[in-house]
Amino acid sequence: MVEEMLAARGICVSYETVRRWANKFGRTFSDQIRRRAPARGDKWHLDEVVVSIAGETYWLWRAVDQYGFVLDVLVQKRRDRRAAQRLLTKLLKSAVKPPRVMITDKLKSYAAARREMKLHVEHRQHKGLNNRAENSHQPTRRRERIMKRFKSRRQAQCFLSTHDQVANLFHIPYSEHTTANARRALRERAFGMWSDISKGNLAA
């Protein structure tokens, strides 16, 4: 994300340089973006995908709202009820209110976690309904190939949490009613916020 933004301005940097920047400033930037973000949608798409970390298999759990904004990510060793419950607990702590609808694939862990937590949320389980969450994993796959796989679980969690918040900032939900001028204004607002955050942290 950052290297693409710089490339648009004719500045070329290596992935290693971006990685060092992310390690130094990433958490601070992502926390500030999250605090400034508006309330997200009330329809949560939850999904999990396999990632390889230092030769071991982990599960990357991700939640996305109906507009394509990533709500949160969690790298875990398992794919059971407790893992699903950890993700839901993390989501509920940062949410303004519980979701209206929760959409997942047919993995039984989600329903078990919902019952255990006594969540009164409509739960829809259908493979075809969850394409939004599945599509959100695609940038992770591309990054894995570039970075030659993550070196540790902590590195993966830190990188993905940071990357998804930055991606959220520049994400413009598709709508046939959004004009080109409106999209341009949203993009300029995102760059303005990024400029404010980066200048503030670099000056500190």
Regions found by a protein language model. Give the residues of each.
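DNA-recognition alpha helix
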Residues: 1-11
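Active-site beta-loop-alpha junctions of metal-dependent nucleic acid enzymes
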Residues: 20, 24, 73-95
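Two-metal-ion RNase H-like nuclease active-site motif
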Residues: 40-53
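Acidic/histidine-rich, metal-coordinating catalytic segments
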Residues: 99-110, 127
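C-terminal domain-tail junction helix/linker
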Residues: 146-148, 157-204
